[in-house]
Structures are given as C-alpha cells and as structure tokens.
C-alpha cells in the first residue's frame, strides 16, 4: 500500500527486512556514505514544509487558538515537531496570541514518546521500544529519529505558555477513529 506512489513513479525500491527502525539504520548509513538525501522527518527542509499544518489550523480558526486543542499522530515525530515549530513561530511573530493545547497520539503498539512524557519530569528517561504490528502502519516506529527535536520543542512550547501531552490509544480506538474520519471527512 505505501509503495504504490514510488513504484508508480518509476522509483527503484529496495525491500529491507524488519520494521521501520531497521530500515532507518540502513538509510542513515547510505546517507552518510553516499550521495543520498534523507527526506524523512530528520530533514529540516521537510519539517519547514510541514509547518503549514499549523498555519492551516490557525487560519481555519481565524487566527484565534484560545481554548483550542490539537491532536497529532506521532510515529517518527516529524508532524508534531512541525506543528509545534509553526505554532511557536506564529506566536513569536504576533500572528496568534494563544497557543493551543497540543497532544501527540501514539498506538499502544509503538509508544516511546508516550512512555517518556507519561512520567514526572524528574523520572523521564527515553528508551526506544520494540514495536508490535499496528493498524497505524506509518506510526510503527520504536525509536523516532526526531525525538531530540521533540524534547527541545516541547521545552520551548511550554516556556511560551503552551501545554503539551501525549496520549496512548488502543488499536480499536484507531480503527474506530479511522471509520469516523472516513465517514465525516
């Protein structure tokens, strides 16, 4: 399913056994030793483009985010870092006056960011997890490469008056939400 676009556009596709985290190790090695550009959430240019999510949400609410709550799925953590970065930029520029409450959402089958933020600050230690199969295939990541960026941006977000949290959801909740979104857009 995820290969239809690259295969359809004529890309050479290599299959790597294992899960996303195994593939990430191979891709990082290739990028370090060959002329290969990483285009995942580790690439700052991609994050800059994804900041448009935050701009679109703010525009949708006529630039008034007071009392709003955003939920963003977390796999490799590119989307959530882009949203935080975009919101912080708009706040710094005076485009918005309030930061919304922001929640990352992780499947119980791949939840290292939730595990980190579910503990009191003094007890937080980041540990990658071994993922289990999930209906949220794109989020089956046990060691998000963007985690250092998440930590830095959460600190900045909270220092600017924003609230951040992460929720863990069941596989059934993901399936139910997918059906709801498909029915209602």
Which residues make up each language-model segment?
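Short amphipathic alpha-helical segments
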Residues: 4, 82-85, 116
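Short, surface-exposed connector motifs at secondary-structure boundaries
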Residues: 8-12, 65-68, 159-160
């Amino acid at each position: 399913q995820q290969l239809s676009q690259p295969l359809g556009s004529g890309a050479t596709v290599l299959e790597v056994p294992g899960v996303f985290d195994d593939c990430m190790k191979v891709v990082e090695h290739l990028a370090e030793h060959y002329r290969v550009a990483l285009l995942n959430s580790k690439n700052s240019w991609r994050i800059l483009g994804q900041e448009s999510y935050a701009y679109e949400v703010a525009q949708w609410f006529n630039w008034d985010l007071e009392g709003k709550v955003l939920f963003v799925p977390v796999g490799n953590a590119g989307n959530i870092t882009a949203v935080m970065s975009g919101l912080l930029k708009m706040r710094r520029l005076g485009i918005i006056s309030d930061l919304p409450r922001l929640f990352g959402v992780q499947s119980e089958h791949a939840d290292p960011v939730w595990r980190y933020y579910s503990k009191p600050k003094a007890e937080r230690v980041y540990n990658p997890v071994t993922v289990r199969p999930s209906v949220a295939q794109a989020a089956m990541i046990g060691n998000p490469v963007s985690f250092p960026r998440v930590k830095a941006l959460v600190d900045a977000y909270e220092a600017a008056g924003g609230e951040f949290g992460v929720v863990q959801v069941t596989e059934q909740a993901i399936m139910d939400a997918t059906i709801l979104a498909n029915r209602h857009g």
